Amino acid sequence: MAAETPAVSVVVPTRDRPELLRRAVTAILEQTYQGPVECLVVFDQSDPDLPWAELPAGRHLVLIQNQRTPGLAGARNSGILAATGELVAFCDDDDEWLPEKLERQVARLLATPSAAVSTTGILVRYQDRTTTRLAPTELVTHRQLLRSRLTELHPSTVLARRRQLLDEIGLVDEQIPGSYAEDYEWLLRASRHAPVLAVPEPLAVIHWHQSSFFSDRWRTIISALTYLVDKHQDLEAEPSGLARIYGQIAFAHAALGERRPARSWARRTLSLNRRERRAYLALAISLGLISAKTVTRLAHVAGKGI
């Protein structure tokens, strides 16, 4: 096998979204990348079922069940452990790669031996609007990720060296409630070892829609973010980053109609960063000035999350 085209294993967790899954898998199998591509579809809490008429040369489709903790994190880990490629990539079942994604990303990762993990820019598609999102720098440090989630480093664009993933970074955390923010938690660990290489091209389409599994799970979001802060205490070294998470917790409480905790968390947020907009949004929602649903929709139209 040529060193320039190592085998890539792509892990696609899925649950009850067959049409979206077929779109994602088609984009993976039709990559222009010249090396072998193994597409591992991991069925979470469902039976493997994805008939495929014919595979392109050098492409392999493997269907497995999640044998670990039910949910996204366990399914992703089941795929990682079953992967045979030198490189491991992630793709959510409702997203799709552009044809040259792997070709360009693998080349950049191989040209940057100090990097173990790479991402690419994204095209966020919500309803009839598409927004381009690129990381602020090509090498994203741990400190930058403490300060900001950087949505541009989307899990559907992750490409990692399998050995470093298993030996240094570790698997996805299956204890985080509802698998919410499991990608951010994993990136925090990855960036401790080396900066994350962010290819400055939008090479994946990220679809935001009402069937997204985290669109309305406010209680889970509160639990997961609290878990994240407890686990990564170095967040306290970056007040603006901690304020962002506190603001998300405040917003979630406000969305649930829990005015007292929403205002309490908003005050904690503003004590760290008076410019954190999520605190003001949480206060506005708690006062009945606007609904959480409206705020979320407007953010998505702009290609942003809460």
Model regions and ranges:
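Short aromatic/hydrophobic "clamp" motif used to bind/position activated sugar donors
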Residues: 88
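Cell-envelope/extracellular polymer assembly enzymes that use nucleotide-activated donors
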Residues: 6-9, 38, 185
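Conserved nucleotide-sugar donor-binding catalytic segment
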Residues: 138-219
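Flexible acidic/His/Gly-enriched loops in nucleotide-sugar-dependent glycosyltransferase catalytic domains
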Residues: 58-60, 74, 102-170
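Acidic helix N-cap motif at the loop->helix transition within catalytic regions
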Residues: 47-55, 96, 100
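Short, acidic, metal-binding catalytic loop of nucleotide-sugar glycosyltransferases
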Residues: 26-36
